[in-house]
Swiss-Prot record:
Protein keywords: Acyltransferase, Transferase
Protein species of origin: Streptococcus pyogenes serotype M3 (strain ATCC BAA-595 / MGAS315)
Keyword Nucleotide-binding appears in the UniProt entry: no
Xref: InterPro entries: Acyl_CoA_acyltransferase (IPR016181), GNAT_dom (IPR000182)
Transmembrane segments: none
Domain of life: Bacteria
GO molecular function: acyltransferase activity, transferring groups other than amino-acyl groups
Name the record gives this protein: Uncharacterized acetyltransferase SpyM3_1195
Length: 142
């Protein structure tokens, strides 16, 4: 599993890991993208342990962390072979499929916290600001 780590690992990553005795058999990473959105990445289970539910447990543990920390949405950029796995966990596809490193990939998202009446105005401003930033980025790059 050592090859599943990257530059983000040393600074801002939260992990969930499933062990079989002392061996890590499934893991995943949480990365905060904005104050309201986060990304799950590098969710992997060793081949001998696939089908045991460990990938789902890792994903659910990271979702629990996401909820507790107050994030509203999670995104995942997944190879097509794992798309159904994430859809079964409540993720929905968005955007076009793309080819990366010889593999077709798809972005998926899941709302973790719903907007509630008592949420403060600062959060509303953060959401509107994020949407405006996305609009400006898309306008500039299209």
């Amino acid at each position: 599993m050592a090859d599943k780590f990257d530059a983000n690992d040393e600074t801002r990553t939260v992990y969930a890991v499933v062990y079989d005795n002392d061996q890590p058999v499934s893991t995943g990473q949480f990365l905060a993208e904005t104050k309201i959105e986060a990304r799950l990445t590098r969710i992997v289970t060793l081949a001998d342990y696939c089908g045991c539910g460990y990938g789902a447990k890792v994903t659910e543990a990271l979702e629990t962390y996401t909820r507790r920390e107050g994030f509203y949405q999670l995104t995942i950029h997944s190879e097509l072979t794992a798309q159904t796995f994430y859809e079964n966990l409540g993720y929905q596809t968005y955007g076009p499929k793309c080819l990366e490193d010889g593999e077709y990939c798809q972005s998926l998202a899941k709302t973790i916290l719903k907007w509630e009446k008592n949420m403060d105005i600062a959060m509303l401003i953060a959401i509107v600001g994020g949407l405006l930033g996305c609009y400006l980025y898309l306008t500039k790059n299209n």
